[in-house]
């Protein structure tokens, strides 16, 4: 058990943060507020076009988990329109262009270059985040990402979701834990930051299963992790096959489990998300999950009440 509170516990603005949030990390790294802007780069997915599978992952809507992403096809203009909306609130902020929808390395390198370089041409963009599948990182793409990483702040977000083969098959992921391990190793060997996405509460998984997935990712020594509850959304295959499934019946049930996960995550791993925020019009369950601010406040309050923090059990 780690009884020494980590460095992020006390912050200069008087907050007592108990997790190493990416927003806190970025503010310390750049010395100012950094905002992540979701972008739809016009990519597709090998799990939709037949090269890996069809129908997509069972939990994905037709937007490929990018319901919040802006996507007119003009990357620079999409960024500019989002920045204009929030510039008044944070006039000194910098921005990270987050390519979120579908699989953002599933294309020839020249297509990737066109999209990513367009984002980096914006004078207020200080970095880039790229979400992808672990089985879509061929050598030429990795070489380009390494070159990109050498001249901007960057991370690659790998969707793992779970390490358990039975769930991977049920969710129609069409990739394996071994694919993830190899992708993470190949990225990190090139000096590229890796952020791993996990879903808590997938159908059929126990608390022990979920903690095993978290522990596995921690053993990879990644830069960051994303955790959130399984959200059943309209337009996903599971909305048809598991229409009555609820991952966590109550907010308190999720809070208890996610805190257990946070306690075993080393404090040097940045947490990019600890909740899900599916748009309310497409959210089926759990109904309480749209109350993101209430949930986050409750997680932090509960951690304070329990006098616990990220990495306490490492």
Q: What are the residue ranges of the model-derived segments?
A:
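Distinct, well-ordered alpha-helical segments
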Residues: 109-117, 138-149, 170, 210
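Conserved C-terminal portion of the radical SAM core fold
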Residues: 178-237, 252-275
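Alpha-helix N-cap and loop-to-helix initiation/capping positions
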Residues: 74, 107, 111, 171-179, ...
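Hydrophobic faces of well-ordered beta-strands that scaffold small-molecule active sites
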Residues: 35-39, 95-97, 128-130, 154-158, ...
